[in-house]
Amino acid sequence: MNKMEKALHELSEMDDLAAQESPIHRLHPAAKLLSTIAYIILTVSFDKYDLAGIVPMLLWPVLLFQISGIPVRTCFYKLRIVLPLVMAVGLFNPFFDRAPLLMLGGVAVSGGVVSMLTLMLKGVFCLMASFLLMATTPIDSLCAALRRLHVPGMLVTLLLLTYRYVGVMTEELAVMTDAYHLRAPGQKGIHMSAWGSFLGQLLLRSMDRAQELYASMLLRGYHDHFHYADIRPFRLPDGLYLLGSVLFFLLLRLVDVAQLLGGLFVR
């Protein structure tokens, strides 16, 4: 199995995760989408020096991982490429903000270090929330919920087609990579001199495949918009989940939970 086939397998694993059964999976897609958006907004609203305040925001993703039955290690494995890029956002903060902000065990910690850690946690928490949304909601249901929320149909169509076509492109890349290695056995990767023709062939194959897909869509009744499957109505448990989640986020945002718990333990 080459790298492209492994990537295709990981894409299918996301669909398998979304097809599982759990209380989180059974919630209305709109409730999960809105709660995720609220979580991300409130998470990024923390001050760059409020490291102690943002740590309790980890409680919500951890709780959802436990209820949904999705292992936390699966999340970090799927995000292994994106996580280093997100965590590198504040990597240079310690060099620009060197003023001491607090003392930790007799060691002065600069504001740049604190802001770097805060930015890293913000990125990690937001990625975890986004992964949970995708891992517990099928893409078709998510797109149907977006249309229910009056998101422009063109944007929803682009999202769905992009998600689906990534798998198609990965499949084409897997076939081309296998063909290349059969013609160049024992060679690691694709030689620099072959990249021009390789990318040209990929472009031609993707254009042909896109024409075939579009013709198939027209034969199945596609006319500028998709006919999404009906999703169940928004029920009381969905509303309670959404309301409870937002109230929980506001509690973590407005109340210094770390200081409150610290005061209880000190007593």
Would you name each region that the model predicts?
Residues 50, 71-72, 152-154:
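Membrane-helix interface segments
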